[in-house]
Amino acid sequence: MQKMPSQILNDGSSVSLNSASMNMANTPNSITVKTAYNGQIIITTINKNISYEELCYEIRNICRFPLDQPFTIKWVDEENDPCTISTKMELDEAIRLYEMNFDSQLVIHVFPNVPQAPGLSCDGEDRSIYRRGARRWRKLYRVNGHIFQAKRFNRRAFCAYCQDRIWGLGRQGFKCIQCKLLVHKKCHKLVQKHCTDQPEPLVKERAEESSDPIPVPLPPLPYEAMSGGAEACETHDHAHIVAPPPPEDPLEPGTQRQYSLNDFELIRVIGRGSYAKVLMVELRRTRRIYAMKVIKKALVTDDEDIDWVQTEKHVFETASNHPFLVGLHSCFQTPSRLFFVIEFVRGGDLMYHMQRQRRLPEEHARFYAAEISLALNFLHEKGIIYRDLKLDNVLLDHEGHIKLTDYGMCKEGIRPGDTTSTFCGTPNYIAPEILRGEDYGFSVDWWALGVLLYEMLAGRSPFDLAGASENPDQNTEDYLFQVILEKTIRIPRSLSVRAASVLKGFLNKNPADRLGCHRESAFMDIVSHPFFKNMDWELLERKQVTPPFKPRLDSDRDLANFPPEFTGEAVQLTPDDDHVIDNIDQSEFEGFEYVNPLLMSLEDCV
């Protein structure tokens, strides 16, 4: 099989297509194809017996190439290498390997040119695009000529196929970018009508439904009743909460207090990421200290970025009032920014403390690993994969207990047995199954905990190799991934037998055999592991086990545990740019506002 570019110059002759070869529903003979072109991914299905000419015809239609446009087709093999398809033989080989490897889809890349000579790359071809997750692609779905894009509809919308309302968390609807047809995500493959490239009339609302309220998800119940606040009945998913005492300044009936930037005093910058700035702020009315995550809307106008913000908000709401997860106070927005007001955890993160201590005593690492395990298990029980466990995201509160933060990488809606496939995470913590391109579930969080526990106990990453820093070829992300996949992890001899055992359990490259991943026993395997033998898990969950380390803090505003490169920054927000605001679709952020009712009750009683 040839793995170098070769020329594909279609002569534009008409091809008589078997209708069963294209845009077919999922059948035993169908193959899902992801075609990457011009920053977009178009998803369609083909018959596995498709001819090379039929494939070229389909690609020409998908990419809207004129008849005289030459182009190059490359499929990506199991090693993420590009292989040119220029003949029926090469197409058959791609399909054969697709079936042999039990792949879920055939990934191809299209370039609107041909190489200048055999062995050269196409114009615009970069090897990095073949690594899963290396760049963001706009994902489209092609069915009967429709080019569907997943959308979240903030206003009332109805499916053109089943006539039912489109609603729910995330992007539940698909919209054709050509004819504007609206359908459910679940219905898009069933659409029989071909796209006309002309806008379709909207499905009219039925008169008898016009006054129906749009279903709204109920706010999550608290993890446990807060002291001095509401008392919960028997703990279960639908426990009733007794109303708290009336606030000192009661609101008008039917209204809910909303917050704005004017309600807060901005004090210091305490963190910064690629999307957001984090500030320490004071709520003027109560003088309570919070952290405020500030995100510029102009940076999240892409659909997938907007989903990331919505996911983080949903997980913040779910996590509120859990002892080991950072909770949400409120959300609000301005024309240019989104604001998350969250708990201020002032003890610093584990990365900050590890840089000063290098390694931790085993009893310290055991305590932190146990509290992290409880937090991860709670998320898993709620159908959430965390996917970004690392030292930076483990905070210490003023007493020394941990709290996980930063939920932007989370995946929601995972039921037992469900999997996902997105390539994401921090490179040093990415699990082997993600690197292999396999579908995965909660197993990736337990792998990351193994990496983090190794770092706490050994003072270094399990994937650090002697002499690697002196060799530029071994300082690349690809080399790190190769080490994670192939190298045997060496446990320091200085660690106890129990510590070595738990590390080997978490760092098993086979997720089916990994500690915490057995379908029946799952979390109980962690609880009963000898490394945690003396841990009282019930007391731990109630925060009644004394932490091994208590951060030194002079006040609730003490920033001694935060890096000075952040705290020394100017705290002011940059002025709004009217031109930038004019280009923001504000409808994408409708309904972002939120107030945590339990925290509100606590504040009102102050």
From Swiss-Prot:
Top class in the EC scheme: transferase
Keyword Cell membrane tagged: yes
Effect of deleting the gene: Zygotes survive to mid-larval stages where they exhibit defects in neuroblast and epithelial cell polarity. Mutant neuroblasts lack apical localization of l(2)gl and par-6, and fail to exclude mira from the apical cortex. Oocytes do not differentiate and display failure of BicD and ORB to translocate from the anterior to the posterior crescent, accumulation of Dhc64C in the two posterior-most presumptive pre-oocytes instead of in a single cell as normal, and defective posterior assembly of the microtubule organizing center.
Binding residue positions for ATP: 270-278, 293
SMART domains for the chain: C1, PB1, S_TK_X, S_TKc
Gene Ontology CC entries for this record: apical cortex; apical junction complex; apical plasma membrane; apicolateral plasma membrane; cell cortex; PAR polarity complex; subapical complex
Record domain Protein kinase: where: 264-532
Membrane topology, from the record: Peripheral membrane protein
Zinc finger annotations (Phorbol-ester/DAG-type) as residue ranges: 145-195
Major localization class: cytoplasm
UniProt tissue specificity: Expressed in the testis. In spermatid cysts, localizes near the tips of spermatid flagellar axonemes (at protein level). Detectable in freshly laid eggs before onset of zygotic transcription so is deposited in the egg during oogenesis. At the cellular blastoderm stage, present in all cells except the pole cells. During gastrulation, strongly expressed in tissues undergoing morphogenetic movements such as invaginating mesoderm, proctodeum and cephalic furrow. Strongly expressed in neuroblasts.
EC number in record: 2.7.11.13
AGC-kinase C-terminal domain segment(s): 533-604
Coiled coil: none
A Pfam family annotated for this UniProt entry: Pkinase_C
Protein name: Atypical protein kinase C
Organism: Drosophila melanogaster
Name of the coding gene: aPKC
